[in-house]
């Protein structure tokens, strides 16, 4: 018997006798283009949802802080001063006017930060009402249009 010139056990499909499988460069490029198109459609929608979620978290935090401040006022017949700030809800203020009926564990466990990593602010008296509780918003600057406060919680 004569062996073929290709050698023992070899054929046109490779050494193992099976056809080699895989994706061509063109197929891989088509998949990458499709993924890019899908990403360009989805990412802008997700970014808009993040902004809405951040705003909603700030609104929720401000409403919670308002409730805690109302409890503070019920116990002490006044809100904390601007100088005492929202920290007066966590620990008893030592700055005048000191509260007379302050609970041992405060009114809240800890102060939340707004979604942009900034502390919420308290103004007493407020510029928009009796008391202003607000976030400086995404830009972190006071007095700008993106501030979120208890005076504009319904704004979208």
UniProtKB/Swiss-Prot annotation:
Organism classification: Bacteria, Pseudomonadati, Pseudomonadota, Gammaproteobacteria, Enterobacterales
Binding partners and assembly: Type II secretion system is composed of four main components: the outer membrane complex, the inner membrane complex, the cytoplasmic secretion ATPase and the periplasm-spanning pseudopilus. Forms homomultimers.
Membrane topology listed for this record: Single-pass membrane protein
Transmembrane segments: 23-43
GO cellular component, one term: type II protein secretion system complex
Name recorded for this polypeptide: Type II secretion system core protein G
One GO-annotated biological process of the protein: protein secretion by the type II secretion system
InterPro entries linked to this entry: Bac_GSPG_pilin (IPR000983), N_methyl_site (IPR012902), Pilin-like (IPR045584), T2SS_protein-GspG_C (IPR013545), T4P/T2SS_Core (IPR050470), Type2_sec_GspG (IPR010054)
Task performed by this protein: Core component of the type II secretion system required for the energy-dependent secretion of extracellular factors such as proteases and toxins from the periplasm. Pseudopilin (pilin-like) protein that polymerizes to form the pseudopilus. Further polymerization triggers pseudopilus growth.
């Amino acid at each position: 018997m004569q062996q073929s010139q290709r050698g023992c056990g070899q054929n046109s499909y490779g050494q193992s006798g099976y056809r080699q499988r895989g994706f061509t460069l063109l197929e891989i490029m088509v998949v990458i283009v499709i993924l890019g198109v899908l990403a360009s459609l989805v990412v802008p929608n997700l970014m808009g949802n993040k902004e809405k979620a951040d705003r909603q978290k700030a609104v929720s935090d401000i409403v919670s802080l308002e409730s805690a401040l109302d409890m503070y006022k019920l116990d002490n017949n006044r809100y904390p001063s601007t100088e005492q700030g929202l920290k007066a809800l966590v620990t008893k203020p030592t700055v005048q006017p000191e509260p007379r009926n302050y609970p041992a564990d405060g009114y809240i466990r800890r102060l939340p930060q707004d979604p942009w990593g900034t502390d919420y602010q308290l103004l007493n008296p407020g510029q928009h009402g009796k008391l202003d509780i607000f976030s400086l918003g995404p830009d972190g600057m006071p007095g700008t249009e993106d501030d979120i406060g208890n005076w504009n919680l319904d704004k979208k």
